[in-house]
């Protein structure tokens, strides 16, 4: 048995294939493995869409198969206070938050880690995220790298982690491609081998986003206008729309000036007037940004920067890396200038920075720097 036999790892068991294979791999590596299933949302009795019971059953079946103990914990109160209330406040302010990033920060790598540490006496926690750790020579501080499977890389969602959290966390599937993960699950006859990956915001599930949000925030219908002020439609609430959005405007059949038949996109939200500004064509100047201003800056493995820095940035998940220049304003606020103008830069979302495969950190987009030709 390897030296790992004296190390206890608590695996976040979600009922999905990634956490299932993570638990299997860690056991193969000789660790003392136990599972912990988190319930982060209290569904109503009539909310049939919620899969928590099914996910727990799948997690239990996997743990039984692997002969590991499964603990359960309810973090619904922490989730409501630290994630969901922020989510609502951001939408109420006309911004577009990313609750999955905050869930990782406040729940999976904070509340979960604290419980595993203080109650279960863990040496490490482990998650089924597609990221990797690296320990540079002569430096005990670990870095976070993109997952080997570029299509599944989740470093964008984990940029808020600290060196200390990364050092205490294992990511067994980060070195694997997704098809390999499923192959291992099938070989081990795990019930989750062919289970569909979860998508969307965890507490909304498969239900329509507008229906869910409307339960918590009153909708405020208003006009959809062109940049020139012509009313061309109605929206049901600014919170239901995001910059660069094409679908859901319900003005698709309307021609613009001069018979322009290009599709319509959300170009701007006028919060003061409760008006949605729509523009035609994906190359419209109003959709473009030269850069952004961001706050809540967090570096994974470095002190706050004092000088201008070149790197790449993602302003949304699955986006190609954008070469950029970071100009520090103070320890928590920065200005980012893109090498080339970008579309759909959205306040409330995260700008995450990279040097090659290393995730450097990230920040919350406060406002975009509009294209000077717009």
Swiss-Prot record:
ATP binds at residues 12-19, 38, 128. It holds the Pfam family tRNA_Me_trans. PANTHER family: MITOCHONDRIAL TRNA-SPECIFIC 2-THIOURIDYLASE 1, TRNA 5-METHYLAMINOMETHYL-2-THIOURIDYLATE -METHYLTRANSFERASE. GO terms for biological process: tRNA wobble position uridine thiolation. This is tRNA-specific 2-thiouridylase MnmA. Keywords: ATP-binding, Cytoplasm, Disulfide bond, Nucleotide-binding, RNA-binding, Transferase, tRNA processing, tRNA-binding. The lineage of its organism: Bacteria, Pseudomonadati, Pseudomonadota, Gammaproteobacteria, Vibrionales. GO terms for cellular component: cytoplasm. Its EC number is 2.8.1.13. It is an enzyme of class 2 (transferase). Catalyzes the 2-thiolation of uridine at the wobble position (U34) of tRNA, leading to the formation of s(2)U34. It catalyses: S-sulfanyl-L-cysteinyl-[protein] + uridine(34) in tRNA + AH2 + ATP = 2-thiouridine(34) in tRNA + L-cysteinyl-[protein] + A + AMP + diphosphate + H(+). CDD domains: MnmA_TRMU-like (cd01998). It comes from the Bacteria. It is found in: Cytoplasm. The record marks 129, 349 as: Interaction with tRNA. The gene is mnmA. The active site is at residues 103, 202. Belongs to the MnmA/TRMU family. One of its GO terms (molecular function) is ATP binding. NCBIfam families: PRK00143.1, trmU. Residues 98-100 are annotated as: Interaction with target base in tRNA. Residues 152-154, 316-317 are annotated as: Interaction with tRNA. Gene3D superfamilies: Adenine nucleotide alpha hydrolases-like domains, HUPs, Translation factors.
